[in-house]
Amino acid sequence: MQARIDATLNEHNRPEGSVRLLPVTKFHPVEDIKILQEFGVTAVGENREQEARAKALELPDMDFHMIGQIQSKKANSIARWAAAVHSVDSEKIAEALGRGVALALDRGDRTSDELPCFIQLSLDGDPSRGGTPLSQVTQLADCISDTTHLRFEGLMCVPPLGWGPEKAFSQARDVLSGLEEHFDRSLEFSAGMSGDLVAAIKHGSTIVRVGTEILGNRPLA
């Protein structure tokens, strides 16, 4: 997988190492994550709060990124274990995460006083798949930036159903460029999975989230 990423970077004249691989370990046991650690992996992505929390307790040296949809009632728990959150899609979630980090710090459940947060972008506005509509992205980014203990890190994008990845990632990259101008700094772009990472890297992805091609088919939940 890393060789495929490196080849794509070279093809599109991007520097080696400019894309990070985030293995997705949903449904995979802790033993599989330990194998990844042996190969130098320091961060993985998880979709479900309860599963991720249990794994984080067993593997305190691994960074766990929350990449699944978030319920506000789970924000306090996520704030205890998450090294980053890729799926913030409302001010309510952002503010709940900020409060959760403060509480976790007070209780000694967290060491880092800052939680990097990505906005999950909804290009088609379909609420059933999560994500923030284009019209609300800048407002939410400002909210994250203004929330104590949160750092606005960038955008996360999954192509909408029926969209080609080229179209989706091109539009998302344009949105990200506008945010970089707004904040006057570079931002991260969490985009691309096994089936569309070439298009994502072409359009500037800095983090690709890959599961099956690294660990094989997920065991049944």
Swiss-Prot record:
Keyword Amino-acid biosynthesis assigned: no
UniProt superkingdom: Bacteria
Family: Belongs to the pyridoxal phosphate-binding protein YggS/PROSC family.
Ubl conjugation among keywords: no
InterPro entries: Ala_racemase_N, PLP-binding_barrel, PyrdxlP_homeostasis
GO MF annotation, one: pyridoxal phosphate binding
PANTHER family linked to this entry: PROLINE SYNTHETASE CO-TRANSCRIBED BACTERIAL HOMOLOG PROTEIN, PYRIDOXAL PHOSPHATE HOMEOSTASIS PROTEIN
Pfam family, one: Ala_racemase_N
Species of the source: Corynebacterium glutamicum (strain ATCC 13032 / DSM 20300 / JCM 1318 / BCRC 11384 / CCUG 27702 / LMG 3730 / NBRC 12168 / NCIMB 10025 / NRRL B-2784 / 534)
Record PTM N6-(pyridoxal phosphate)lysine, positions in chain: K26
Alphabetic keyword roster: Pyridoxal phosphate
Its biological purpose: Pyridoxal 5'-phosphate (PLP)-binding protein, which is involved in PLP homeostasis.
Name recorded for this polypeptide: Pyridoxal phosphate homeostasis protein
